[in-house]
Amino acid sequence: MTAQWQDEAATFGNRSLRDVDYVYVWVDGIHVKVRLDTDKICLLVMIGVRTDGHKELIALSDGFRESSESWADLLRDCKRRGMRAPVLAVGDGALGFWKAVRDVFPDTKEQRCWFHKTGNVLAALPKSAHPGAKRALAEIHQAEDKDHAIAAAKAFAAEYGAKWPKAAAKITDDLDVLVAFFDYPAEHWVHLRTT
């Protein structure tokens, strides 16, 4: 059975990507708790949506944590197999993916995951501030357009920045890549905000 799985994995990992254009890709590193030689291995996952709207797994690979070297290896392999630069990539801010994608597919735009970002912001706030902060963050990523999102981000920084500057900076420092999804069709926004 293991040999069959290995054959299927090799076939999947070597298939041509020349005939497919991926508009958007979502990336994440999944840390699994299994007993291996090292505890720093994670699964690097890249899912893409084609121009026809079909979503599919593009690549799955093991990597050392979520290092830029591991992501670059995965991306270079996809490029070698014919993958062209996706228009937009969505992922969390902790990934080494961003350095790797800038090197391998420099024309790909970046969108940070709002689910992860919300968790990061809340971690920098006392629990008593969470309900209001969640509402304020939702006003940013659920705004009617990019201008309203930027205005909501400024309001968030004004409300929370004096007492909790680290929480506010998590939004203001990354604002351009948090609101990038607004540059794409509105019907795609719900999918592009998060991994």
Show which residues each predicted segment covers.
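RNase H-like nuclease fold core
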Residues: 2-91, 95, 99, 104-107, ...
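Non-catalytic, well-ordered alpha-helical scaffold segments
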Residues: 41, 95, 116-119, 131-135, ...
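A short, ordered amphipathic alpha-helix with a cationic face
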Residues: 62-64, 123-127, 190-195
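Short, charged, low-complexity patches
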Residues: 68-71, 126, 130
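Inter-helix linker motif
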Residues: 106-123
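A polyampholytic, Gly/Pro-enriched intrinsically disordered region
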Residues: 128-145
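Acidic/histidine-rich catalytic cores and adjacent linkers
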Residues: 143-195
